UniProtKB/Swiss-Prot annotation:
Keywords: Repeat. InterPro entries: Chorion (IPR002635). Residues 1-19 are annotated as: 4 X 5 AA tandem repeats of G-Y-G-G-L. This is Chorion class B protein M2410. GO terms for molecular function: structural constituent of egg chorion. The keyword Repeat applies. The keyword tRNA processing does not apply. GO terms for cellular component: egg chorion.
Length: 110
């Protein structure tokens, strides 16, 4: 529209689709950086060449999130499984740092 419309320098100034700031990276699927640190030991390992018969249980508290791994072969006449639980299943972000909202609206809404 003569260089002043939606695709030019903005909508009556420097807004829509032109040089205006705001509503940018926060709404474009950018990353969410997360850094965690554990005060507790970072691993738990149970390793043995022995044969376990019956139920083997390991319990305790792990920080935030954890993993479980089984290596080896299970005999076809028996069963093998991992029952792994972490809290009540709710994982949430309790605090965020950083810049917060975008830079604001463009200067050309008028």
């Amino acid at each position: 529209y003569g260089g002043l419309g939606y695709g030019g320098l903005g909508y009556g100034g420097l807004g829509y689709g032109g040089l205006g700031g705001g509503c940018g990276r926060g709404f474009s699927g950018g990353g969410l950086p997360v850094a965690t640190a554990s005060a507790a030991p970072t691993g738990l390992g149970v390793a043995s060449e022995n044969r376990y018969e019956g139920t083997v249980g390991v319990s305790g508290n792990l920080p935030f999130l954890g993993t479980a791994d089984v290596a080896g072969e299970f005999p076809t006449a028996g069963i093998g499984e991992i029952f792994y639980g972490c809290g009540n299943g709710d994982v949430g972000i309790t605090r965020e740092g950083g810049l917060g909202y975008g830079a604001g609206y463009g200067g050309g809404y008028g």
